[in-house]
C-alpha cells in the first residue's frame, strides 16, 4: 500500500505544472502524388490573400518560390501556407513551393489541380510555354515546409482591447484550429478562420494577459501566453510542429512542441515518459523490498 502511495505522489510530481514533450510519428497529411497539375504564372507575389505580405519580410517564407492555388485547392484559405514538391516533366527538376495566394483567373484557376506560379518559380520548371496543361506530366505532392525556427503569431493591424485577429505563420504544417483563453475565463474558445484568408479573428477580447492555443492538422498543440493586445506585435511561440514520417524536406526529429497539462485534448505520453515511470517504479519497489 505504501508503495502505491509513493508511486501516485511520484506521478503527480512528474506531470503537475510541467510540459509533456512528444512528437508525431506519422506524416500528418496524405502524401499522394498528383500527376494532373496544370500551371500558369503571375508577377505580383507580395499582395497575396494569405496575409504573409512581402515574401522576404518578417511574415514571409523568405524566398519567392510561391504559388497561388486554384479555387478548389485554395479551399477558402484552408491551404494557406501548405508546401508542395513540384516535379517538372520538362527538365525532371523538383522544386518546393508554398501556397500564399488564391488564383483568380476565371478560366485556368477553376481546374481541379491548378498552380499559378510566381514567375521565378515557373521559370525553374523549364516549360517551353507560359501555360502548362494538366496532361503534360507536371505533378505535385504535399510536403512539410522548409521553415527555420519556431511557429510565430502576429496580431493584425488595428488590434485593440476589444478586438484582434491572429496570423499564425512559419509553421511546417497547416494549422487546424486556433483557440483563446481570456484573463476572465478558464476555458479555451475556438476561433473561426476568416473566410478566404488566413487570419483568426476574436471579437470578445478583454484587457490583460491571455493564452492562445494553436492546433496543427496533426493533432499537436502549441500554447503561448501573450501579456496584452498590441497591433502587429509578433510573438515567437518557442516551439515547432513535428513532421516525422513525411517524405520530402527533412527536419530535426527531436524538435519539440509542448502540450500543457491543462489541455482539453491531452495526447498519450511518449514512450520516454512511460519508460521513465517504469524505471522509477522499479527503484521504489527495490527500496521497499530491501527495507521490509
UniProtKB/Swiss-Prot annotation:
One of its GO terms (cellular component) is membrane. Residues 47-150 form the Expansin-like EG45 domain. Residues 289-292 are cytoplasmic. It is found in: Membrane. Glycans are attached at residue 92. Residues 25-267 are extracellular. Disulfide bonds join 50-80, 83-145. InterPro entries: Expansin/allergen_DPBB_dom, Expansin_CBD_sf, Expansin_CellWall, RlpA-like_sf. Keywords: Disulfide bond, Glycoprotein, Membrane, Signal, Transmembrane, Transmembrane helix. The keyword Glycoprotein applies. Residues 1-24 form the signal peptide. It is a single-pass type I membrane protein. This is Expansin-like protein 6. It comes from Dictyostelium discoideum.
Amino acid at each position: 500500500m505504501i508503495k502505491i502511495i509513493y508511486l501516485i505522489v511520484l506521478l503527480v510530481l512528474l506531470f503537475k505544472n510541467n510540459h509533456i514533450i512528444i512528437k508525431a510519428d506519422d506524416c500528418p497529411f496524405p502524401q499522394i502524388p498528383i500527376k494532373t497539375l496544370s500551371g500558369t504564372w503571375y508577377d505580383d507575389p507580395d499582395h497575396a490573400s494569405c496575409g504573409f505580405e512581402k515574401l522576404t519580410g518578417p511574415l514571409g517564407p523568405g524566398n519567392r518560390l510561391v504559388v497561388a492555388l486554384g479555387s478548389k485547392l485554395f479551399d477558402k484559405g484552408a491551404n494557406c501556407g501548405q508546401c508542395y514538391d513540384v516535379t517538372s516533366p520538362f527538365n525532371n527538376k523538383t522544386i518546393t513551393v508554398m501556397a500564399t495566394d488564391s488564383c483568380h483567373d476565371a478560366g485556368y484557376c477553376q481546374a481541379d489541380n491548378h498552380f499559378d506560379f510566381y514567375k521565378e518559380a515557373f521559370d525553374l520548371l523549364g516549360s517551353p510555354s507560359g501555360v502548362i496543361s494538366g496532361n503534360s506530366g507536371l505533378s505535385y505532392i504535399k510536403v512539410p515546409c522548409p521553415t527555420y525556427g519556431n511557429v510565430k503569431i502576429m496580431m493584425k493591424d488595428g488590434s485593440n482591447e476589444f478586438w484582434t485577429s491572429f496570423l499564425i505563420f512559419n509553421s511546417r504544417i497547416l494549422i487546424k484550429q486556433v483557440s483563446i483563453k481570456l484573463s476572465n475565463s478558464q476555458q479555451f474558445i475556438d476561433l473561426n478562420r476568416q473566410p478566404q484568408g488566413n487570419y483568426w479573428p476574436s471579437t470578445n477580447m478583454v484587457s490583460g494577459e491571455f493564452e492562445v492555443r494553436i492546433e496543427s492538422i496533426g493533432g499537436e498543440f502549441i500554447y503561448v501566453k501573450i501579456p496584452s493586445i498590441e497591433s502587429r506585435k509578433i510573438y515567437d511561440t518557442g516551439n515547432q510542429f513535428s513532421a516525422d514520417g513525411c517524405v520530402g524536406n527533412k527536419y530535426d526529429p527531436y524538435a519539440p512542441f509542448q502540450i500543457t497539462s491543462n489541455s482539453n485534448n491531452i495526447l498519450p505520453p511518449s514512450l520516454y515518459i512511460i519508460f521513465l515511470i517504469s524505471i522509477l517504479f522499479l527503484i521504489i519497489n527495490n527500496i521497499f523490498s530491501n527495507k521490509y
